[in-house]
Amino acid sequence: MRNRLLATIAFTAMTAMTAVSGLTPGAAQAADPIKVGAIVSATGPASFLGDPEKKVLELYADRINQAGGVGGRPVQLTVYDDGGAADKAASFTKRLIESDGVDVIVGGTTTAATMAAVPLVERAGVPFISLAGAVVIVEPVKKWVFKTPHTDRMAAEKVMEDMKKRGLTKLALLSEDSGFGKSGREQTVAVAKERGIELVADETYGAKDTDVTAQLTKVKNNAAAQAVLVFGLGQGPAVVTKNYRQLGISLPLYQSHGVASKEYIRLAGGAAEGVRLPAAGLVVAAQLADSDPQKKVVTEFTKVYEDSFSSEVSTFAGHAYDGLMIALDAVKRAGGTDKAKLRDAIEQTKGYVGTGGTVTMSAKDHMGLTLDAFHMVEVKQGDWALVK
């Protein structure tokens, strides 16, 4: 029954949302609203993540309200743009809790923004669904904190799984000096030890660096390296990719899921050709097998997104969609917006098929995705291609 409910909410949000509440469009306006707060980096260095998140949250809140709301209640969405600054994320989180009186928060585009919000939501007892990637967000488990994207640990595991298939066992790592990059480095080091991969180089670069040739020259001169992994967000990974090709490095180049967006390919240009990275099925929706449970969801989401914004679908938009749908499904199952009951309902999410995979949470797992929710993709002729 629960799986059916999840599927109904996800499907009707895109196609026939009147079925969510069973009411006619506009009827939701008479009831008390479900107050959803959001903090995203719609501008600033992480805008290629946060802008599509903001657009999707606003789009689906409006579509759900036009269809009658959730259980007859409209969704009242309050969105703040932190510009990629953790201190602003903390300030806006406090405002959402104390002034706006939200029932649940969806957001935290970056790991830094999320971790700035975590102590505030934990103290206040407000359910918080992060849109950021680092495993530290949910490990160890925090009572009120959940997340929708795959973790950096999973990304490292998927990359090393692919390396092993290619007979590669020696890795050079370049990580960004951001919260995401630091956590990604930590997880890569740990996973390498577990997977029998030797880390032969360990370099860092600044999130705003416009040239990384010094670090890459060290990698080029390292005779032991067989592959290179970059952990970063925004323009940095594109800079690394361009410098990589300019130096004539021929080793296989991997990126993290933090750049699973066409924006990365646009920024890196032809230098991105051949780059591999782990990503959600959303970026290769048309290439998924018809038997894949995600196929219908990601195909429909892609159509709605691209029809609405006249731009290619974004993985990060999908994270926001999943966060909102999980939150609203939990409201239905909790029978309202009592925060403790809502938190419990989010934790009890089972079998939600979203853009990131099939989500089954528990008291020990506040993300709910497994490694098979990730797909290895490669840039071919300026587009994503599923690696088989």
Features from the language model and the residues they span:
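Short, low-complexity disordered leader/linker segments with a strong preference
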Residues: 1-35, 66, 97, 388
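Immediate post-signal peptide segment of exported/extracytoplasmic ligand-binding proteins
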Residues: 25-38, 66-74, 164-169
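Extracytoplasmic "Venus flytrap"
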Residues: 34-58, 80-87, 109-110, 174-182, ...
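Beta-alpha junction/loop-to-helix N-cap segments that form part of ligand/metal-binding clefts
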Residues: 48-55, 67-137, 148, 205-209, ...
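Extracellular/periplasmic Venus flytrap/periplasmic-binding protein
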Residues: 91, 135-137, 143-248, 291-292, ...
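Periplasmic-binding protein-like
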Residues: 96, 100-109, 129-131, 170-175, ...
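Extracellular/periplasmic periplasmic-binding protein-like sensory domains
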Residues: 241-319, 383-386
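Segments of small-molecule ligand-sensing domains
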Residues: 304-317, 328-384
